[in-house]
Design a protein with these regions (language model features):
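Small-residue-enriched flexible segments
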Residues: 216-280, 297
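Catalytic-core signal marking the mid-to-C-terminal active-site face
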Residues: 33-43, 282-375
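N-terminal glycine-rich anion-binding loops that anchor highly charged ligand groups
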Residues: 36-40, 56-82, 96-107, 297-301
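Phosphate/diphosphate-binding glycine-rich loops and adjacent basic-rich segments that engage nucleotide
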Residues: 179-247
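Generic N-terminal amphipathic, Lys/Arg-enriched alpha-helix
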Residues: 20-21, 25, 29-54, 307
Length: 375
């Protein structure tokens, strides 16, 4: 099965705004031209098929595909369908249980643990957020820790699910170490993402999805390929010294960079505290690496954390709806510098989603080939 490089026979560079591929750090025309447009229904079907062929049961394959397509639709390409090949590798290798028997245990009115049984993290995280939302509608606020899990993709997928259920939702996960501490000379924290979603009447949800590192690792890999220098203060060499040479990068710097990285390091620590320490899961620096390893057999025993808050149990839904509508209207109307525009968290992603509904989802050719969809 083949597809044209872009709508109406035009090239990708002629039809795709460069920011649509922003998460991969893609900024040059040659790199943008190295993608193909794929219709979402076909991309979904092929991704599901790849996971099933690797042995994943329906719940595992469905949740992973749902989370990957969330990322691909919203322009978070590093966590989109490009991860399908990695997930099939760990399913076949034995690191991930293809047929997990997840179990949850409610320990209080607003607290629970969910055992992912070493399955892919997507199904566990969706289940944890669903459980947290249900408990929050009773208790007002509820947290669910996930244990014995694996990589769950884009944290925003689960915050969005909670927001679409009408609650304020927070999701996070610690990951294997790739980020130095502020002033540190070795990897200690993962990129440790934090996502927050909130419902907005008659609008898309307010949606924050961010890593606690200065830049994503994919940005380093891209700049290495392009031979471009990195911005100052975002990465370090093997001795922990800041470097702008992507070939010398051994670790990332925390959010805030050389001068203010203590803020990002503390945020990463908060994610570790809630995802790993609170749940008894593996600490970042003790975790088997997602990649950069030959071990695709040993479970990584990752932890996640999901929190849900029901606005009905605080000031009430009517006041919440009025306040968040006014807040966002005033935010978007706030004065901007010349040539700039003001956006709320999620605005850029919703614009990407709308564009990709029109053009199809751009996928790198290697991933398209893996899914049997390359031109």
């Amino acid at each position: 099965m083949t597809f044209a490089d872009g709508p109406a026979g035009r090239t990708v560079a002629e039809t795709v705004p460069l920011f649509l591929l922003r998460d991969s750090g893609r900024t040059d025309e040659a790199d943008v031209n190295d993608v193909v447009f794929l219709p979402e229904p076909i991309l979904e079907a092929r991704t599901l098929a790849a996971l099933r062929e690797a042995g994943a049961n329906e719940e595992t394959a469905g949740a992973a595909t749902r989370a990957m397509l969330h990322a691909s639709r919203l322009g978070i390409d590093s966590h989109g369908v490009r991860l399908a090949s990695h997930y099939t590798q760990v399913l076949r290798g034995g690191r991930v249980n293809p047929n997990p028997a997840m179990k949850s245990r409610r320990t209080a009115a607003g607290a629970a643990l969910l055992d992912a049984d070493d399955g892919l993290g997507h199904a566990a995280a969706y289940a944890a957020m669903d459980l947290a939302c249900g408990m929050a509608k009773e208790a007002g606020i509820a947290g669910v820790g996930v244990i014995r899990s694996s990589h769950f993709g884009a944290a925003g997928a689960y915050a969005l699910a909670g927001a679409e259920a009408g609650l304020i939702a927070i999701s996070m996960s610690n990951t294997d170490a790739i980020v130095a501490l502020h002033g540190g000379a070795e990897r200690f924290h993962g990129t440790n993402p934090i996502a927050v979603g909130a419902p907005v009447p008659n609008q898309k949800p307010w949606l924050l999805d961010m890593a606690t590192s200065s830049i994503p690792l994919n940005r380093v890999l891209l700049y290495r390929t392009l031979g471009k220098a990195l911005p100052e203060g975002v990465a370090a060499d093997s001795s922990g010294q800041p470097t702008q040479d992507p070939a010398d990068v051994e670790m990332l710097m925390p959010l805030g960079g050389t001068d203010f990285g203590f803020k990002g390091a503390a945020l990463a620590g908060m994610v570790t505290l809630l995802s790993a320490v609170l749940t008894g899961s593996t600490l970042d620096h003790l975790m088997i690496r997602m990649a950069e390893t030959d071990d695709f057999e040993t479970p990584r025993r990752m932890g996640h954390f999901c929190l849900a808050i029901d606005p009905d149990r605080f000031a009430g839904r009517a006041l919440f709806d009025e306040a968040i509508t006014r807040y966002l209207a005033d935010l978007r109307a706030s004065a901007a510098r010349e040539g700039e525009s003001i956006m709320a968290p999620g605005d850029r992603e919703w614009a990407v989603e709308a564009e990709r509904k029109r053009t199809g989802i751009p996928v790198d050719r290697e991933t398209a080939k893996f899914l049997g969809l390359a031109v």
